[in-house]
Amino acid sequence: LRHPHHDKSPRQPLGRNIITSLWGNCTIKVLVGFLFLYPAFVAKSHDAGAWEQLKILGLIGAAAGIGNFAGNIASARLKLGHPAQVVVRATVIVTAAAIAAAVAGNLMVAAAAALITSAATAISKASLDASLQHDLPEASRASAFGRSESVLQLAWVVGGAVGVLIYTDLWVGFTAVSALLIPGLAQTLVSYNGGSLIPGFGGNRPVLAEQEGPRPDPAAMPGAR
């Protein structure tokens, strides 16, 4: 007789560091998605000439490119001994930049927010990857990396949807996206301290989950040198 195959391997729990890093990265990705689409709608909505539209898109695009380049260099050189803490700080800075852009409502501050956000998302993603690499056994990492990418893409889509649907005044757009970032930041901070604003989503977790396999040597982690 054939017996049905049952996968008896327990599901690998996620520790507080990974949960915090996921919440922070998702919060930042919302603003990344927003900034990818919103400036184009702002440029097209105003009765400006082609050069003025090019100025808006070029300034924000250049700022985002410079920020991404700087963030990748910084993440390669940083010692990610406390990746969750790095993500928390990046989320605070990004949320503050979005609020500043909402208050100022001008192009230069929006470009500065794009630069900060692009740098922060590169550093935060490297920190999340370091948490997954260090906190999970090898058998669970591939699945965890795949699921985290799916969650981050969903957060990006949410931010992009806000950029498409919201009114095309800079202060209105950044106010709307800040209204999403602030709860995300709050959840990130609460998760870092071991709680959760949403029952069942990150609360009451150990800093490091109990692993079902050997934990890799921190010295071998990317950025540890």
Predicted regions: what they are:
Residues K44, V157-L181:
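Transmembrane alpha-helix termini and helix-breaking/packing motifs in multi-pass membrane transporters
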Residues Q85-A100, S178:
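Structural signature of the two symmetry-related core transmembrane helices
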Residues T20, G24, I28-V32, A64-A76, ...:
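Substrate-agnostic recognition of the 12-TM MFS/MFS-like secondary transporter fold
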Residues L1-V30, N204-D217, M221:
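Juxtamembrane intracellular "pre-TM" segments in multi-pass secondary transporters
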Residues A102-A114:
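Helix-loop junctions at membrane interfaces in 12-TM secondary transporters
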Residues S9-F69:
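A single, central transmembrane helix in multi-pass transporters
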Residues A176-G213, D217, A224:
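Multi-pass alpha-helical transporter architecture, strongest
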Residues V42-A50, G81-H82, A102, S131-L136:
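Helix-to-coil boundary motifs at intracellular loop junctions of multi-pass secondary transporters
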